[in-house]
Curated annotation (Swiss-Prot):
(6S)-5,6,7,8-tetrahydrofolate binds at residues 131, 135-137, 256. PROSITE patterns: SHMT (PS00096). Pathway: One-carbon metabolism; tetrahydrofolate interconversion; Amino-acid biosynthesis; glycine biosynthesis; glycine from L-serine: step 1/1. The record marks 239 as: Plays an important role in substrate specificity. The modification N6-(pyridoxal phosphate)lysine is found at residue 240. Its main location: cytoplasm. This is Serine hydroxymethyltransferase 2. InterPro entries: PyrdxlP-dep_Trfase (IPR015424), PyrdxlP-dep_Trfase_major (IPR015421), PyrdxlP-dep_Trfase_small (IPR015422), Ser_HO-MeTrfase (IPR001085), Ser_HO-MeTrfase-like (IPR049943), Ser_HO-MeTrfase_PLP_BS (IPR019798), SHMT-like_dom (IPR039429). The keyword S-adenosyl-L-methionine does not apply. Belongs to the SHMT family. Its cofactor is pyridoxal 5'-phosphate.
Amino acid sequence: MNSHYQNHSLENFFSTNLSATDDAVFAGIQAEFTRQNEQIELIASENIVSKAVMQAQGTCLTNKYAEGYPGRRYYGGCEHVDTVEAIAIERAKKLFNCEYANVQPHSGAQANGAVKLALLQPGDTIMGMSLDAGGHLTHGARPALSGKWFNAVQYGVDKETLEINYDDVRALAVEHKPKMIIAGGSAIPRVIDFAKFREIADEVGAILMVDMAHIAGLIATGAHPSPLPHAHVVTTTTHKTLRGPRGGMILTNHEEIIKKINSAVFPGLQGGPLMHVIAAKAVAFGEALGPEFKTYIDSVIDNAKVLAEVLQTRGCDIVTGGTDTHLMLVDLRPKGLKGNKAEEALERAGITCNKNGIPFDTEKPMITSGVRLGTPAGTSRGFGAEEFKLIGHWIGDVLDGLVENPEGNAEVEQRVRKEVKALCSRFPLYQ
């Protein structure tokens, strides 16, 4: 190989692959790929990105510091990353039909933190959905910054319907007069009425923030009503149903708000943006603007309904009786099971999900009375209704086996794992 390097180690630095330079890390990555390829992923917050998104994230853009915003950077040499970030911003605005977008937050939690930094003061009252009802840590949960720096009031769900009771939300808002009301969550299977939330916010003079992280893909395709006509500010992750890289984003239609948001993201909360991730976000937004993405989201929702229906026939209780979205909560109490034990048994059988509290759960967060299931990742790899019927019955088999033997039913779990592996081999990843 011809080169001008005086030091041969530099030649290796620029040319040698990971497998040759760090076999320990390479082995870990390969093992994780095998796990993803051979198991069924039902964690509702996970998805599978396209090869193009993955390629964009693994580029030389990781080398570039770009503190600031396009056209207003603190470093030189940013003309090309400016172009990439501008593409991401314009595509995000088009995708969600809004006026302004900040694509720099490293995560959904960072996006939520930036909104609070921009629009609130420590000690202000905020109102968000409680964790046990389907909310998120960043919406005012005690262990999180949002629960420590602010006077956090939590709303829940109706004891009968297990859905949001907007009259109860209004009564709580009138009583506590929050500076900000947060709508959205991490385990809400039904459509959220953002217009009703805005009415309540206006009545008490509150800012309405919507966290659409879980349903951003549904909103992008019109499968769920958009919060943008109603919310003052909207946050989201860029993975989950949006099927992009792990990251966050903030959207608004208000110029005075985006100015505060931009200052809160940088220099308020973050330093240099991750330009390789922003490039991957731009690619994912471009994919989501195509007609294939709408077909994908429609299938995600259809598959979720199929899975919920099969589980109901197998004696599982689905919280709210079904789902309008990509996810469902399975109440395991009728089977006498705990969420942590069900999660472990399903993983032994090659099906990955997460234990999850259900509304009014009396179990501890690391135990729980339920599991949360979602269809985005399975749908991304090509599973349709017939495959999700099989998956529903496999879950039923594993849970019934666990009822018979609370320590795990090896015979059932090994049989299901073999069938899972055979199904996954028909829908391989990145071939």
